[in-house]
């Protein structure tokens, strides 16, 4: 079944490091040369908090797969010392020590890594750990990009925290250029009504608050359940049929999942499926708010544009 494993982690969402010790200067004479204190490093996280470091992060822990991908995109993968289960991209991330899962990170195991920066996602899940890190003087940065445009911004901010601006800046600009190209290419195209399949048994979807809907908008797609009151509502088959989507979009783990989805929707009588308009995109790329979502958006735009062809 597609997206069953990805759904909980993808939609559940909806501290400063100590500075240099102050030395006793009372015995200093006028001849003692002054030592310039390095300027603190600042970056605003996705909760609007100012995160401050005394020096670039060199022992960071990520608590979400997308955060790991963002760190690597910022050129700072070498400075990760641990992550969570499921944080598997890029391949180098699979060699990192695992300190639990994203919903219940183990504070003791995290503290044992001697981190100087925690990159978290869900405040509710990270709160107990954040309290421990606060006592230890370890900064916590919350990463939760809500739009495609926020992804390159996140890469740049992480570059600041790690001191890898020389790598992060060009990476962010490349992502922006690709997004700008999509916006220019698909602006004004005929709208395509899309059902976002976040689960099939039972049926779940995503509303406008999801970053997937932002990708749809970029491609000229219209989320047929965009106005749902919650981010990931369960919906009935009758509601999907009544919405009359032109296409179905689902995150998949393997190409065979798309064929199974197509067969399932055909059996349920969805006209879009009868026309073959059921599309699958790698679930991790589609649902993680990281750099690979730009890849997913490019594929999505191309899929929807083929549907527009006579």
Language model feature labels by segment:
Residues 107-114, 136, 235-244:
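Short helices/loops that flank or line small-molecule/ion binding pockets
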Residues 64, 122-123, 198, 228, ...:
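Short secondary-structure boundary segments
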Residues 124-135, 247-264:
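A ligand-binding cleft/hinge motif common to bilobed small-molecule-binding domains
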Residues 44-48, 99-108, 124, 228-237:
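Short helix-initiation/N-cap motifs at beta->coil->alpha
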Residues 40, 49-50, 116-117, 121, ...:
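Extracytoplasmic substrate-binding proteins
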Residues 2-66, 164-196, 247, 302-310:
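Bacterial Sec-exported substrate-binding components of ABC uptake systems
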Residues 58-113, 117-122, 224:
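A short, structured surface patch at a secondary-structure boundary
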Residues 209-232, 252, 277-280:
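His/Asp/Glu-enriched short active-site or ligand-binding loop at hydrolase and phosphoryl-transfer sites
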